[in-house]
Amino acid sequence: LDGFGKTNGRLTGMVKKFIPIAKKSSLTFTGRGGIKLHGSDMPEIMAYRLGGPYTIRGYKVNGVGTGTSFIMGSVELATPIPFVDRLKVNFLQNLRLTFWVDAGKVFDPTIASVLYDRPIQAITAGIGLKINMPGVGPLSVDYGFPLTNPGPNGSPNGYFTFGVGDMMY
């Protein structure tokens, strides 16, 4: 349990830019990064993780890798689904079709990333549905597939991810 009982510091930041397109569509750019500030070996539990619905969609949680620092970005186009507004169902007015690309890399991979032969870096693209439910917040389902080698433990055919809350918290 190397690293436990020691002081470790991390710094994480995020930049997000929304650009409205037409009446109900938007383009979102997101960039995130994190780094270990001080301390000796970072315990696995404190490592940054990439893969899953809030980081690199199209991979299982932690499927890209874990490490002491990371950088990632995402571009997402959200637009209403054609003809859904004609259904006159209130909550469906908040339903959006999304097209996105995620990319990221972890640095100084942890022992788990090495043992499980995770790819450490990934670029994915995909399509999804997002709905903003009153009282719950955004719900999303995405299907993404890797544009880079997913490694021996990843799926070259892609992966579904489900999210509750903001896509890139």
Language model segments and positions:
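C-terminal beta-signal and adjacent terminal beta-strands/loops
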Residues: V101-Y116, G135
